[in-house]
Amino acid sequence: MTAVEGEPASVELADASRWYGNVVAVNDISFRLEGGVTGLLGPNGAGKSTILHMVAGFLAPSSGSVTVGGSPSWRHPEMYRRIGLVPEREAVYPFLTGREFAVAMARLHGMEPAAAAEAAARAIGLVELEDAADRAIGTYSKGMRQRAKVAAALVHDPPILLLDEPFNGMDPRQRLHMMELLRGMAAEGRTILFSSHILEEVERLAERVLVIVAGRLAASGDFREIRRLMTDRPHTFTLRSSDDRALASALLAEPMIAGAALDGGLLTVRATDFGAFSRAVSGIARRHAIRLHELLPTDESLESVFSYLVRR
């Protein structure tokens, strides 16, 4: 790929919302991107795909604005040449070979046949699909189809790349290569926005994170800040011991404990510091001659973390 000349292409949402009938998919979101890799992190159904499709010009915002390089992306064909989109859905033709698919996408961007063939070969090489380039896409694995979609998005060398759950179906080696490829393109000046519901993917790749929950922007910043918000939230644990009532009394004397309750033979504890509580609880039990039988965190799913970020 060639380095992007001039300033990085900007992507901006200003009070952007999108609804379908009575369903609000994106609710009054604002952010601005200029170069680098940004991760859209959120549970399935949070509105990440809708945001990407509005930036790509496939959907109009119901209110607010979505601009690319200062111009609206909706119904602006010139913008399409500046954007490469990797959708989550299976947007490939199984009867075409990988090479034919990439060439077709290049031709749709106005390239002459010779230039399209050259661009397709370059894009296929970038995603390491050369060995399967002349096989029908219908014979590809899920990870190979993902790479074919990425090649199609790169074929016209766009300054902006939008990827919706791009690592689905890829094996660990393919994921590592794709992350290195995206980092390299960002270093050349491109603006890259990708979605994921997997925390580790975003942590490894993104310089900036946008946390989306129920169509709202719950948090944004670098990953250290997002991690701090996630770690510092209250955590709920369930415990079973030889004497739950005595353990509850002992725990409530600790500054890290925000609350404790006994219900149906189960002790539920709220702690303000996950790590400190996990390290200290066994020692507290021993000091009071209590045998600890079970300790389980009950709210460690991403959905619970995201819900906390929305409520804070």
What do the PLM-derived regions correspond to, one by one?
Residues 43-47:
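Walker A (P-loop) phosphate-binding loop of ABC-type ATPase nucleotide-binding domains
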Residues 56:
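Helix-to-loop junction immediately C-terminal to a conserved catalytic motif
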Residues 64-79:
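Conserved ABC transporter NBD signature motif
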Residues 103, 107, 114-132:
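Conserved ABC ATPase "signature" region
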Residues 161-165:
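Catalytic Walker B motif of ABC-type/P-loop ATPase nucleotide-binding domains
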Residues 178-272:
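ABC transporter nucleotide-binding domain
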